[in-house]
Amino acid sequence: DLIQRRMKFIELLNEISGQMYAYISGKEKLVLRYHTHFKDISKEGILDKYKKNYKRDIFQGTTVDGVHKDDLKIFLDENDAGMFASQGQQRSIILSMKIALVEIVKMQIGEYPVLLLDDVLSELDEERKMKLLNLIDHKVQTFITTTHFDLGYHHSLDDALVLRIEKGTLKEDK
């Protein structure tokens, strides 16, 4: 049941993340895949695998096979993003997934969660910054931290509260 739930969740995350990535980046196709080590993901198949490996697991003092070994595989145009994605592509993937998670929370509980973007904008070019800000524009209460306040102009920042820490003192920017 856990594997099926994870697969269903990753399917939804894949769909929404792919849309977000296409909007932010507009280039490659993002695909998320759930990878399990179980050949048979039925309850009986998983139980069978645990029974088969029980003595070995006791001897080794660890569970060798299990859902803890499952993984999320990320691809850009069918290439393993972990091996081939640039730092900018990796940042865009993470942001796409984060925004997708915000949308999933909204779908599940009916309201947006608070979003924290911790120094992520400094690594984006102007176009990607603006697209990210468009995605969260007035929908999501967002805290953006940065060491360099260079967000550029975006209408969603017109009514933003900007706080600056300068020499240990918190100041409000006007």
Task: Name each region found by the language model.
Residues 118-120:
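Walker B catalytic acidic pair
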Residues 165-167:
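Active-site donor-binding loop signature of nucleotide-sugar glycosyltransferases
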Residues 145-148:
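H-loop/switch region of ABC-family ATPase nucleotide-binding domains
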Residues 1-114, 123, 127, 131-134, ...:
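Conserved NTPase motor "head" modules and their coupling/switch loops across ABC/AAA+ ATPases, GTPases
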Residues 143, 161-163:
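Hydrophobic/aromatic beta-strand patches that form the interior of the parallel beta-sheet core
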